């Protein structure tokens, strides 16, 4: 018998491919146990084994909120036929990410394993905006033709409002009780609609150029809009009149967002390279103004921490801000998050994952950092050492294709291991600067070297 033929007949052993998965259910179980028995949160010390002590984002709403910064690159996803991605939106329970493309398609991605689930043709033209209702029962999408479509959670379209604007729709927002919604468009006006019957109720006119953004206050009867005429206007939805105008910006206002948790603050970004936060309780007093060398393109508040928000920039970088820690500069920067301009940002409702999309036609998922991560600053999103297939990287272990570096590919050798500490460091000041660590002494090795978790 031919030996080679016998070998060919034997089925070859197949090796499993590891796929990263993010699941917070076990940490929620532990948090409920601690609350039930009146126990305090476990400490997080600078040692790898303390990763198990990281609780869900809800546990760090006020104290140690820096733990919730999504600074670690976890996964990159893209469609086979790649298009620019104007909008992304998490489902209300946070299990799936809905991605809208320039071709008018919806694609669904799993929120824990980041696998592709399905794709469908939703609009005839580019989908420009999407928004779920507060109750999570409906989703509204708008396109470049000025058409609005209303969807059920199973993506069954129940109503279409054809060409309600003469130009493309830029943004949409639900009222706090989901009974009405507002749309804004490049035709210089905003419109308020009754959600039950789809009838137009008010026309908000006052801008002199394209209206690029709108938002409805989470508690009050108040609408904010930002326009290409450099103005930010506040509207009364009952009378349809403008109640206040902010003249702080010198160029197109790209995004205006109320603070979703309490509604006390209003954040806005503009093409004049500035990001400003206003306090509604103090006659719209300017609480923060940050300028940069590149344009701010996208803005999104954290769904858990009331003082934190994230801004996406024209050069593809991500910048995290915390008003309770620093009002003059971002507390953390991911300099090479994308290759091109960031076009959409969305926080998972649970708060443990941040999804971003850009004109490089990819979706990237970011999670919270881990204590003493040896790959912290050696990631290509920080040092820009990107090559073919870099996004598989060391995070996927078996199928790693990125070359190993001195500090980033594996844990430090035994001689330089981080010793365990018995006391919890409560003096968390701020995130360290974005630079690749070069530990030289034992004292320096004890300091934090991971992005987003200064412990």
From Swiss-Prot:
**Where in the cell?**
Nucleus
Q: Which residue intervals make up region (Disordered)? A: 406-425, 430-455
**Keywords, A to Z?**
Chromosome partition, mRNA processing, Nucleus, Repeat, WD repeat
CC annotations in GO: chromatin; mRNA cleavage and polyadenylation specificity factor complex
Q: Which residue ranges have biased composition labelled Basic and acidic residues? A: 432-446
Each WD repeat, start to end = 80-119, 122-162, 164-203, 206-245, 248-288, 291-331, 337-376
The record's Gene Ontology biological-process terms are:
chromosome segregation; co-transcriptional mRNA 3'-end processing, cleavage and polyadenylation pathway
**Annotated transmembrane regions:** none
State the Pfam families in the record: WD40 (PF00400)
Q: Which domain of life is it from?
A: Eukaryota
Question: Known PANTHER family for this protein?
Answer: PRE-MRNA 3' END PROCESSING PROTEIN WDR33, WD40 REPEAT PROTEIN
Function as written in the Swiss-Prot or TrEMBL entry: Required for 3'-end cleavage and polyadenylation of pre-mRNAs. Also involved in chromosome segregation where it has a role in chromosome attachment to the mitotic spindle.
**What is the recorded name of this protein?**
Polyadenylation factor subunit 2
Give the gene symbol.
PFS2
């Amino acid at each position: 018998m031919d030996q080679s033929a016998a070998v060919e007949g034997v089925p070859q052993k197949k090796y499993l491919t590891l796929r990263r998965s993010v699941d917070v259910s076990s940490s929620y179980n532990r948090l409920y146990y601690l609350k039930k028995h009146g126990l305090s949160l476990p400490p997080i010390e600078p040692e790898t084994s303390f990763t198990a002590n990281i609780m869900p984002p809800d546990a760090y709403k006020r104290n140690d909120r820096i733990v919730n910064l999504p600074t670690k690159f976890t996964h990159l996803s893209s469609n086979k036929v790649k298009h620019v991605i104007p909008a992304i939106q998490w489902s209300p329970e946070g299990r799936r990410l809905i991605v809208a493309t320039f071709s008018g398609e919806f694609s669904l991605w799993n929120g824990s394993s980041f696998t592709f689930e399905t794709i469908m043709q939703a609009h005839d033209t580019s989908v420009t905006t999407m928004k779920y209702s507060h109750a999570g029962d409906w989703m509204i999408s708008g396109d470049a033709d000025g058409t609005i479509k209303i969807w059920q959670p199973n993506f069954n379209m129940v109503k279409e409002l054809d060409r309600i604007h003469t130009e493309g729709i830029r943004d949409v927002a639900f009222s706090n009780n989901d009974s009405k919604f507002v749309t804004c468009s490049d035709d210089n006006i905003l419109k308020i609609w009754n959600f039950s019957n789809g009838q137009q109720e008010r026309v908000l006119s006052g801008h002199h150029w394209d209206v690029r953004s709108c938002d409805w206050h989470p508690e009050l009867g108040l609408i904010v809009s930002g326009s290409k005429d450099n103005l930010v206007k506040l509207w009364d939805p009952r009378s349809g009149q403008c109640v206040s105008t902010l003249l702080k910006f010198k160029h197109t206002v790209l995004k205006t967002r109320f603070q979703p948790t309490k509604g006390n603050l209003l954040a806005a970004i503009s093409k004049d390279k500035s990001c400003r936060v206003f306090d509604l309780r103090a006659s719209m007093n300017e609480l923060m103004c940050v300028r940069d060398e590149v344009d701010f393109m996208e803005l999104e508040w954290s769904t858990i921490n009331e003082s934190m928000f994230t801004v996406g920039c024209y050069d593809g970088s991500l910048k995290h801000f915390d008003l309770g820690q620093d009002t003059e500069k971002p507390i953390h920067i991911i300099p090479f998050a994308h290759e091109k301009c960031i076009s959409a940002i969305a926080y998972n409702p649970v708060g443990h994952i941040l999804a971003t999309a850009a004109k490089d036609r990819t979706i990237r998922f970011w999670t919270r950092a881990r204590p003493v991560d040896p790959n912290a600053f050696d990631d290509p999103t920080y040092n820009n050492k990107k090559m073919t297939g870099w996004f598989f990287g060391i995070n996927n272990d078996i199928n790693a294709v990125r070359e190993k570096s001195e500090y980033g590919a594996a844990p430090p050798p035994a001689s330089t291991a981080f010793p365990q500490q018995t006391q919890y460091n409560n003096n968390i000041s701020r995130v360290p600067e974005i630079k690749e660590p070069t530990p030289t002494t034992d004292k320096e090795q004890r300091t934090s070297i991971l992005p987003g978790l200064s412990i």
